[in-house]
Amino acid sequence: MDFSILKHLTGLAGVSGCEQDVRAYVKTLLAPHADRISTDVMGNLIVYKKGTSDKNLLLCAHLDEVGLMVNYVGNDGFLRFICVGGIDPRTLLAQRVRLQTKEGPVLGVIGTKPAHITTEADRAKAVGLKELFIDTGLPVEQVKRLIPVGTTAVLDRPYEEFGDGKITAKSLDNRAGVFVLAELVRALENPFYNVYAVFTTQEEVGLRGAVTAAYGIKADLALSLDTTGAADIPACSPQDYIIRLGEGVGITICDSYTIGNPQLVDALRAICEQNAIAYQLRVASRGGNDAGAVHLSKTGVRTCALSLPTRNIHSNVEIVSKHDLEMMFALALHVAQHEITF
């Protein structure tokens, strides 16, 4: 796998609803490998690769990332904001962001009342969004001209490899899934299924792109490629880990939005066991992904989510494992190349 592609993907800005830069890069990357490529009204990028059968496989990975949106520009030049997608405000304090303006990205820093003028009661409380602001360092007039209400901002942290095959970056949710799906399209040769590789939009705000994309494809089965929170850290007990970093691709049995098709789950487990693909079973009481929309399309689609273990999810220091990425790729590629019978 070419991890320079993942590095480039994580460096792009693509808050939900503003995925155009990510989509353009993926389209350029995959156009030479596609039999057909199109973009729909919702902004989903649909890459089609003809198979040797008349059966259709839908593979999806969402382009968007969590981020911020300016909802107030003060007369002092400081910006107030809301979160786009689920972000814990505790992770935002003292972080850098890049505001996406029509004249290019603008650096900002998230601040709050400084510690030396807060009370003991203030310091005992968790900082909420209303206590945070973005400081661009620019004159008020320039801020008001460049950064109107509705401007989005992404967390600002570079891709870095560290430790034993680990990667940390912002937006690994879900540029990691996009990377795996893009590498799959580049690797496919004479797949059994007609493969629809769909790079969806607005997953982080309600699986919206997947709803319309799935409706336009008569899929026989589907896989969603996405990240999931790995809680294998000192603050959590083993029963709450959900999934562990470095132990393989997650096959999702159940989450808040989807119960994985039992026959498909069994087939995926068998593929892993027969092909030395490391896997884990994921059962989560919270969270979901595009599978939640896809499996309800039309009269229903056999669907399962492949989940990539990710520490610090929805932050600017998300962590994934190269090993897990390789296992997700191997499983998804095998599914595309060979018929699954039920």
Protein language model regions, located:
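N-terminal hydrophobic/helix-forming segments and targeting peptides
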Residues: 1-342
